[in-house]
Amino acid sequence: MSIPEVGKKIRVTVPSTTANLGPGFDCLGAALDLHNEFIFTRIEGGGDRFDLIMESTDGNHLRGGPENLVFRAAQKVWESANMEPFALEARVKLAVPPARGLGSSATAIVAGLIGANAIMNSPLPKEKLLELAIDIEGHPDNVVPSLLGGLCLTARSSSQRWRIIRCDWHDSIKAVVAIPAIRLSTSEARKVMPKNVPISDAVTNMGALTLLLNGLKAGNDELIKEGMFDKLHEPYRWKLIKGGLEVKDAALQAGALGCAISGAGPSILALCKKENGKEVSQAMVKAWEKSGVASRAPFLNLQTTGSQFSTISSR
């Protein structure tokens, strides 16, 4: 396999994700229509050169190097394809805010895998990219929907293979995501969780997840209300999110069917019917204002196509 010519460009768009949705800890996630865009260019130099230029929505520019997740993912592709590394530049337009529980790390991993693979004319199948993405991230709930799109349930089978189920999401159910101007790292959010939980809590979550998935499939309000409930991670994480429980209560009082921490937080996901969306969004923002936290709460539709790439220039 030959190294791509200098100047070849690939555009990759990767959706944000909301993980867990309450009871689906580390196994359930949904892609949302907020995207990061990556432009990969083959540049002069060897595999130890990787230039990452990031432009955020506020116009700020940041730079990153070989320690970045995008580059680490690209390296995994080269290793798996038995390909000699080559120099890459990645320009990123950031719309997914980092450390907010919206899968920003997953977008970096997925983009690095797809970009490096596509610029070499895709020697690795999508199944292999999924395997590499889960290996890098350590859990599947963000990277799988980020790559595939839609609502995805991922579990390791008795044969130790990853099994992915694309679940239905009824058109009548909409997502409002309250995104605060505060950050919370995944590592910090995981530190507060216990290593062991009562079996009764595990059983409760299994039942809740079943109710939630059936409610989302049928658009059944009551099943969603009863299923969007968690005892494995949220009881320990709410204390890390300033004003979070008040935001949840405000969303439910405004008509949300259910409310949960998005991923590791601090963003908060509310599921509702379209006619309640505006009231839910406003209530969540106002509740955070009372705690001294600025936020925004946009409607984010389910993104069903997953990550996409296109060739901008072949040389």
Curated annotation (Swiss-Prot):
One of its GO terms (cellular component) is cytoplasm. It catalyses: L-homoserine + ATP = O-phospho-L-homoserine + ADP + H(+). The keyword Transmembrane does not apply. GO terms for molecular function: ATP binding; homoserine kinase activity. One of its GO terms (biological process) is threonine biosynthetic process. Its EC number is 2.7.1.39. ATP binds at residues 97-107. Keywords: Amino-acid biosynthesis, ATP-binding, Cytoplasm, Kinase, Nucleotide-binding, Threonine biosynthesis, Transferase. Disulfide bonds: none annotated. It is found in: Cytoplasm. Its main location: cytoplasm. NCBIfam families: PRK01212.1-4 (NF002288), thrB (TIGR00191). Belongs to the GHMP kinase family. Homoserine kinase subfamily. Catalyzes the ATP-dependent phosphorylation of L-homoserine to L-homoserine phosphate. This is Homoserine kinase. The gene is thrB.
